Amino acid sequence: VHWSAEEKQLITGLWGKVNVAECGAEALARLLIVYPWTQRFFASFGNLSSPTAIIGNPMVRAHGKKVLTSFGEAVKNLDNIKNTFAQLSELHCEKLHVDPENFRLLGDILIIVLAAHFAKDFTPDCQAAWQKLVRAVAHALARKYH
């Protein structure tokens, strides 16, 4: 993936404002609520019976933070996203058997969360840069599936 200087600035500038715990928890909760079939990967998380239960579930919040923290590694390593996610790709493919389409869904949800939290800063140019980033991350995570 080639990044222009402007794209890098838009991504890193917004990332500096992101509350990883809050946005990560919200993104994962939204994934589990909007796409309920993804809940099967989180059976060990306990009560996922309703949107309220999911939003209030401490394991969802903790894993959401973990997911977005690892996403931050992509922001730090824009020029080496494939290698940054090589181990996570292997884990999700070979051990967890996660459908790689779910990575794309989570990326789309992250875009929605960022737009909701940073409406003024989330310009069309910023959205385009972030859309490119979430696609690159989803592709890197799906790499071991090919």
UniProtKB/Swiss-Prot annotation:
One of its GO terms (molecular function) is peroxidase activity. InterPro entries: Globin (IPR000971), Globin-like_sf (IPR009050), Globin/Proto (IPR012292), Hemoglobin_b (IPR002337), Hemoglobin_oxygen_transport (IPR050056). Keywords: Heme, Iron, Metal-binding, Oxygen transport, Transport. Residues 2-146 form the Globin domain. Heme b binds at H63, H92. GO terms for biological process: hydrogen peroxide catabolic process. It comes from the Eukaryota. Gene3D superfamilies: Globins (1.10.490.10). PROSITE patterns: GLOBIN. Red blood cells. Involved in oxygen transport from the lung to the various peripheral tissues. Heterotetramer of two alpha chains and two beta chains. Belongs to the globin family. PANTHER family: HEMOGLOBIN FAMILY MEMBER, HEMOGLOBIN SUBUNIT EPSILON. This is Hemoglobin subunit beta. It comes from Vultur gryphus. The lineage of its organism: Eukaryota, Metazoa, Chordata, Craniata, Vertebrata. The gene is HBB.
